[in-house]
């Protein structure tokens, strides 16, 4: 595991350096000549976005606002090296579980947050992509469409089957010999359904939209056209849906649609700086306790705080 994490950590800088060498860009010079105003803008808009999303996340999880902010900041950092639910979603859940002492509930609600992140972000990209369409966009169109369909279908299934007996689901659980996990699945479904009311869908979607718009403001310093700035930001987001550490390769490719290579390198460095800020809170995750709980699930299909207790 340590070797895999080390490789994941090394991939993003290695790809940026390789990109720089390919286009004959002085990587060190890009760092030295980084515009401090642009750096400040990227950090400021990123943190403001997280402050907005923390309002949404605290509504969903019922944890204190600052706890939600820390979880979001830390989750994004972990997501740099561990893509998908095992990264940022699980990291946020571990922070929430320190507050509510319930890992299953925390993880289910963390996935509810991810629903808004992915679906709203993907729809924004799909709506705006025609502003400056490129053959390369086909990759990101597939990624965003697939995620919209998958998340909407999956979340819809969870909501409509909560507290219901689904024979096909029971047969599948038995076939896969996961009977001990069934109560955990049902508990997770209940948490998602409770958090997904009509009012919550509207308010949480609007907060997510606002967060992405605020984050896009940083690009206005380079390209003074806000619709295009939002598209650039959402293209970067679309690249993050592809499960590789820090969207390495795909982020550079997406940014290359709009910018010259030197600017691409600078923007990638800025984005990595933003997302790495969360590592300052890495102690918020109790890795030892998290491993203990998941080992218990793996062995017995149960948690210390069982759904029936």
Residue ranges of predicted features:
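Extended hydrophobic secondary-structure segments
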Residues: 86, 91-92, 105-106, 121-125, ...
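Transmembrane helix boundary and interhelical junction motifs in multipass membrane proteins
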Residues: 51-56, 84-93, 231, 236-256
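Helix-loop junctions at the membrane interface of multi-pass solute transporters
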Residues: 59, 80, 84, 92-100
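Predominantly cytoplasmic-facing regulatory/coupling regions of multi-pass membrane proteins
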Residues: 1-75, 131-241, 270-309
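Membrane-interface alpha-helices at helix entry/exit sites of multi-pass transporters
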Residues: 69-70, 84, 88-89, 99-115, ...
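Long, hydrophobic/aromatic-enriched structural stretches that serve as scaffold segments
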Residues: 74, 89-94, 102-105, 189-192
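Membrane-embedded alpha-helical segments of transport systems
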Residues: 78, 82, 107-130, 149, ...
């Amino acid at each position: 595991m340590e070797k895999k994490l080390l490789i994941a950590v090394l991939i993003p800088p290695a790809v940026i350096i390789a990109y720089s060498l390919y286009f004959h860009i002085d990587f060190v010079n890009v760092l030295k000549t980084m515009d401090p105003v642009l750096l400040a803008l990227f950090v400021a808009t990123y943190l403001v976005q997280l402050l907005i999303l923390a309002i949404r996340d605290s509504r969903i999880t019922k944890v204190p606002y600052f706890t939600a902010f820390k979880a979001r900041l830390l989750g994004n950092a972990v997501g740099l090296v561990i893509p998908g639910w095992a990264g940022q979603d699980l990291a946020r859940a571990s922070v929430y579980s320190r507050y509510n002492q319930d890992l299953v509930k925390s993880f289910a609600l963390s996935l509810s947050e991810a629903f808004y992140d992915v679906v709203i972000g993907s729809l924004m990209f799909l709506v705006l992509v025609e502003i400056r369409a490129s053959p390369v966009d086909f990759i990101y169109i597939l990624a965003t469409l697939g995620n919209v369909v998958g998340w909407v279908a999956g979340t819809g299934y969870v909501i409509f089957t909560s507290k219901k007996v689904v024979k096909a689901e029971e047969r599948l659980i038995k076939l896969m010999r996961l009977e001990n996990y069934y109560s955990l699945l049902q508990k997770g479904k209940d948490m998602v359904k409770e958090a997904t009311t009509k009012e919550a869908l509207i308010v949480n979607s609007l907060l997510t939209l606002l967060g992405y718009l605020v984050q896009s403001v940083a690009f206005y310093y380079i390209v003074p056209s806000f619709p295009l700035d939002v598209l650039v930001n959402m293209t970067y987001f679309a690249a993050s849906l592809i499960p590789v550490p820090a969207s390495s390769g795909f982020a550079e490719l997406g940014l290359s649609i709009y910018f010259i290579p030197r600017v691409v390198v600078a923007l990638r460095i800025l984005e990595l700086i933003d997302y790495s800020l969360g590592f300052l809170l890495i102690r918020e995750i109790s890795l030892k306790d998290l491993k203990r709980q998941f080992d218990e699930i793996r062995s017995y299909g149960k948690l210390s705080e069982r759904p029936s207790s």
